């Protein structure tokens, strides 16, 4: 197998098995809902559909995406399934695969997802990648674990407030890491970590941020301009993609099935988003937000989701009630994956921060 070092495989969900893609010899490249593209998605998708999905399709139709060897879609929601369907019409030149993603964690679902990862490994090989090898997969898992560890150290410094424009800088690093191979990114983060502490560089009101898609660094700059200091976040386009995935390979042998099955288990057990259900603890998402907000020292919580996101629409009332019961101030924002939409919320953000002072 001969492969260019920048042979990209596109993805659009934080549940994508990046280490498996990397072990096959590809560079995972997140297709973000950014860029200045004409609104064309309405020709293939309903207008009242997730703007994250529509903006990605706009980029694909406008050919404002990197040269991709293939595209991986995780079956995370109905809108993402529709994007998979539309992609085959919009970009038949870029092969794609839809990987089914269970909504709950159980032994049966882990076994099912393991089968899906095996299927993905076979497709990656058909696309020109390397055959699944346990040593290569283990090496890739170690690289992404190291990357996640570096981000954890940066997050700690951002939470402490000793990096000027910390949240904005961290988001810029997340964005770059989502389109860059882990090896060079590790070096860049080491340089970032070597910066000396600037003392209490950010003196804004500490706020915890959660939601799904909010990639724009300008949005984080706006929060800072409004007087907020983001001391913790849980976003699909932020920390959720770069937290360590626990892969406990307790098998006595080195069969690829053993490591891959544990990887499947680790992915399903990572920090859940709104589309993931914990059947015996239906309010766990709200509890996670409260726990994270308290650990970060936040005075309030801001939620930001894209419009028409059914999983979050269903969860927000319970989250709001739980935060109210705990006495934690809460502001809910909604956007369409443009800086303009978050900018329109400036007055509400400023008023919320002023209330927290």
What is the role of each PLM region?
Residues 12-34, 211-281, 285-290:
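Redox- and metal-dependent alpha/beta enzyme cores, enriched for Fe-S-associated oxidoreductases
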Residues 55-126:
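Acidic/His-rich segments in extracytoplasmic proteins that coordinate ligands and/or metal ions
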Residues 317-357:
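Peripheral docking tails and interdomain loops at the edges
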Residues 60, 280-297, 314-315:
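A short, acidic, amphipathic alpha-helical segment used as a generic capping/interface helix at domain edges
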Residues 68-76, 298-307:
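Acidic beta-strand-to-loop metal/phosphate-binding motif
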Residues 10-13, 18-19, 38-42, 50-58:
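Metallocofactor- and cofactor-centric catalytic cores in central/energy metabolism, strongly enriched
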Residues 37-46, 105-110, 239-247, 341-344:
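Short, charged, surface-exposed secondary-structure boundary motifs
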Residues 3-7, 114, 118, 122-249, ...:
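A charged, amphipathic alpha-helical module
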């Amino acid at each position: 197998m001969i492969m260019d070092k920048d042979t990209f495989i596109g993805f659009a969900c934080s549940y994508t098995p990046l280490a498996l893609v990397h072990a096959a010899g590809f560079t995972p490249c997140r297709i973000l809902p950014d860029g200045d593209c004409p609104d064309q998605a309405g020709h293939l998708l309903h207008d009242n559909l997730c703007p994250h999905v529509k903006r990605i399709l706009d980029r694909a139709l406008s050919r404002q995406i990197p040269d991709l060897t293939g595209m991986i879609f995780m079956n995370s929601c109905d809108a993402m399934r529709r994007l998979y369907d539309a992609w085959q019409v919009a970009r038949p030149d870029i092969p794609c695969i839809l990987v089914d993603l269970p909504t709950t964690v159980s032994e049966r679902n882990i076994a099912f997802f393991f089968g899906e990862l095996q299927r993905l490994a076979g497709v990656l090989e058909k696309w020109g990648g390397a055959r699944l090898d346990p040593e290569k997969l283990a090496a890739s898992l170690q690289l992404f674990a190291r990357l996640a560890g570096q981000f954890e150290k940066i997050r700690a410094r951002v939470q402490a407030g000793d990096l000027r424009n910390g949240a904005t800088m961290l988001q810029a690093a997340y964005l770059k890491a989502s389109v860059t191979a882990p090896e060079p990114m590790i070096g860049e983060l080491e340089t970032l970590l070597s910066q000396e502490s600037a003392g209490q560089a950010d003196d804004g009101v500490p706020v915890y941020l959660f939601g799904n898609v909010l990639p724009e660094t300008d949005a984080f700059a706006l929060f800072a301009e409004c007087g907020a200091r983001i001391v913790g976040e849980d976003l699909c386009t932020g920390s959720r993609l770069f937290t360590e995935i626990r892969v406990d390979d307790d098998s006595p042998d080195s069969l690829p099935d053993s490591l891959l099955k544990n990887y499947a288990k680790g992915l399903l057990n990572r920090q859940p988003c709104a589309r993931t259900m914990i059947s015996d603890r239906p309010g766990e998402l709200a509890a996670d937000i409260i726990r994270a907000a308290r650990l970060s020292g936040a005075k309030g919580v801001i939620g930001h989701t894209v419009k028409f996101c059914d999983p979050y629409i269903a969860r927000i009332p319970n989250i709001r009630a739980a935060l109210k019961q705990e006495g934690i101030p809460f502001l809910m924002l909604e956007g369409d994956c443009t800086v303009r939409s978050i900018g329109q919320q400036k007055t509400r953000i400023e008023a919320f921060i002023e209330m927290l002072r």
